[in-house]
């Protein structure tokens, strides 16, 4: 799931997944962090989910995927679209 908050100069985007599916650490990897694994690792929240928040520029499109333990890449089903290999997010 993706939670968004529009800001005056951009968007605050929170990527949310269940706390234990998939198991192990998960990070969101995309063009906004130069596709660097571990740059934005999802952390547990008190509501039984895990999440990470990033700030992105307004009126932009970003490609991203999730990376879990064991080199398991997967997409966000609630993204704004897909470009074949990646999920897309519009701010």
Stretch-by-stretch model annotation:
Residues 9-59, 69-91:
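Aromatic-rich carbohydrate-binding modules that target alpha-glucans
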Residues 1-9:
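N-terminal edge beta-strand
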């Amino acid at each position: 799931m993706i939670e968004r908050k529009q800001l005056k100069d951009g968007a605050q985007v929170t990527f949310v997944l269940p706390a234990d599916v998939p198991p192990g650490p998960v990070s969101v990897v995309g063009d906004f962090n130069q596709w660097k694994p571990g740059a934005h690792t999802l952390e547990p929240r008190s509501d039984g989910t895990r999440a990470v928040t990033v700030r992105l520029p307004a009126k932009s499109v970003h490609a991203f995927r999730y990376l879990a333990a064991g080199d398991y890449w997967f997409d966000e089903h609630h993204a704004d679209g897909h470009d074949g290999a990646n999920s897309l997010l519009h701010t």
